[in-house]
Amino acid sequence: MVIAAVTATSAGASLQPPAGYQQPPQHHAASRFTCPSFPAPFTGALDFTSKYEGSDSARATLNPQADHAFHEQTKAITELEKVVSQVVTGFARDGNPARADCVVNGLDAWARAGALTAVAKNHTGKSMRKWALATLSSSWLQLKFSPTHPLDRQQQKAADVEHWLSHLADLTVAEWRDLPLKRVNNHSYWAAWAIMATAIVTDRRDLFDQSLAMYRTAANQVDSEGFLPNELRRKQRAFSYHNYAIQPLVMIALFARSNGVEVTAENDNALQRLARRILSGFDNPDVFTRKTGIPQDSAFTQHASSIAWLEGWCALQTCDARTNQRISALRPLHSTRLGGDLSWLFAAH
């Protein structure tokens, strides 16, 4: 089990990711690689249609037309996330420095254009910024901390990319911190994860501390039964959104531990209560049906990307045989916005 490589126990120590981010590539092979085309930098205002447009306050019913518009409007951003994640995952497998060069050059173009830094005119725009940041920073970490030092080949461009990511993190902090508690939900947790990943990329302890503060707010929202009241409002998607909400929290806890901070005990072991509630739902979602009074959509439990967070969870603590069996049946578990191949990053080798 891979947990932490270096512990930063003092304020002066450099921030470090978990050990999986500092592994050498799985093997070194002279594999052929052609850098894919990167989408043109998105420099416009972050003003996107919500896929739940027209839904009631529960925001639980998809609007097919709005969903299509959302995907069209955000295509360049999501394509960037996909390309970066795939190329970095390939680098973790074969260590081909051309893959790192590909990512550096692609992101440098976005950085030089000031992409994703324009005003976010609505909630969906703010959401896309922090989701993209989560993907880019958690992928970049694997290049930055690789023992093969692939970023040394293009140091100035790498520095420019990191400066851009740092700026995106500042914008994300401004948009998601200090919200009224009734508005703090999974979106804030994902923002906190994006901020944490960028804190490690840039070695900025102010971002690290901000992410931990947001984590603690999240932990204090977990009730005595392991539910998140703001996610229970999502009606038939309450179970799904609990599963979605825990993902960034697990990652933050792992990164905090790698730097000498243990947050899992917050609010009487809130993260464990939340995880146990969700895991019980995997076996029988009726617990969420009874709580909300509405049958739950549980199709997501069959999708590997939706349970990829379990690799991280089982690095935080020992998982039981049932959970390990669930994970092993679907490996490798990949989540673009959590850093790519989480089986490689956290599971035993």
Placement of each model-derived feature along the sequence:
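Sec-dependent signal peptide recognition
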Residues: 1-3
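Extracellular glycan-targeting catalytic surfaces
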Residues: 12-181, 189, 255-258, 263-349
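Long, repeat-rich segments with strong aromatic
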Residues: 202, 206-289
